[in-house]
């Protein structure tokens, strides 16, 4: 018989949300860094 799930605590929700935000921030930082290095010509990455 189905039973309602327990509610996720606010602190746990905030921790998960912050972790998710941090991953996005790091990805964006990496992308901007790569774009900057390509524009300045100091890139060591081969762009096709």
UniProtKB/Swiss-Prot annotation:
GO molecular function, one term: structural constituent of ribosome
Protein name: Large ribosomal subunit protein bL32c
UniProt family annotation: Belongs to the bacterial ribosomal protein bL32 family.
UniProt subcellular location: Plastid, Chloroplast
GO cellular-component term (any): large ribosomal subunit
UniProt keyword list: Chloroplast, Plastid, Ribonucleoprotein, Ribosomal protein
Pfam family, one: Ribosomal_L32p
Gene source species: Vicia faba
Superkingdom to which the source organism belongs: Eukaryota
GO terms for biological process, alphabetical: translation
Source organism phylogeny: Eukaryota, Viridiplantae, Streptophyta, Embryophyta, Tracheophyta
Key word Ribosomal protein present: yes
């Amino acid at each position: 018989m189905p039973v309602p799930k327990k509610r996720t605590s606010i602190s746990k929700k905030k921790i998960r949300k912050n972790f998710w935000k941090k991953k996005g921030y790091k990805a964006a930082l990496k992308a901007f860094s790569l774009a900057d290095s390509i524009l300045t010509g100091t890139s060591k990455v081969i762009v096709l």
